[in-house]
Regions:
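Surface-exposed binding/hinge segments that line
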Residues: 3-4, 10, 25-70
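Gly/Pro-rich hinge or "lid" segments in bacterial periplasmic/extracellular proteins
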Residues: 57-114, 118
Length: 193
């Protein structure tokens, strides 16, 4: 592996905001960022074109995973895009676009080996197929939003499956365009909320 440090963060955002980032869907989430400067080994400063009130939320997800600079420089962007390396407790062992990704436990993970030996994520976009796979035991879990609310009863009524609801740190929010259009008027935004 290589260090997860400020240089890696800068490299990640230089890449995301540069030519390679233009090829993917995540760049649009970070258009407020002008550039990133390294302060020390574990600190960076983000310089913005304009305020972005949800930037911290975006940095916690939305494709802001920090990438390994040396690995990408050695193998190239195209290779990395189908053979990714990260900081998690699993390693990608196989990836078939629009089908599945297979992961195996990384015994030398800095946080210790995970409790599972392997995990396979299958990309099933058709709800009835996902439910059939769940009820037959070919998949262990199906996550929202794959399953419409109307199918919950059939899952609960099946002897091999159950619906489990868990609290999550999800935040529902309205984001207004404050630059143009009707929501540029503060009174309109206040009336809505």
């Amino acid at each position: 592996g290589e260090p997860f440090n400020a240089e890696a963060v800068k490299f990640t955002f230089d890449r995301l905001l540069g030519e390679e980032g233009a090829r993917g869907p995540q760049r649009s989430n970070y258009t407020a960022i002008s550039h990133v400067e390294v302060i020390d080994d574990h600190t960076v400063d983000f310089f913005l074109y304009q305020p972005d009130p949800v930037l911290l939320t975006k940095l916690a997800g939305y494709g802001a995973m920090i990438v390994p600079p040396n690995y990408i420089k050695e193998h190239g962007d195209d290779y990395f895009n189908t053979n990714p390396v990260g900081t998690g407790p699993f390693q990608v062992v196989d990836y078939t676009p629009r089908s599945d990704v297979k992961l195996e436990a990384f015994a030398d993970h800095w946080g210790g080996a995970p409790k599972l030996d392997s995990v396979t994520y299958r990309f099933i976009s058709e709800p009835s197929t996902a439910v059939a796979e769940l009820q037959s035991g070919r998949v262990d879990i199906v996550l929202p939003p794959t399953i419409p609310i109307g199918m919950i009863k059939s899952i609960n009524d099946h002897p091999n499956t159950e619906v489990v609801s868990v609290a999550s740190p999800t935040v529902e929010a309205l984001r207004f365009n404050t630059q143009t259009g009707i929501t540029a008027d503060e009174r309109v935004r206040q009336a809505i909320i």
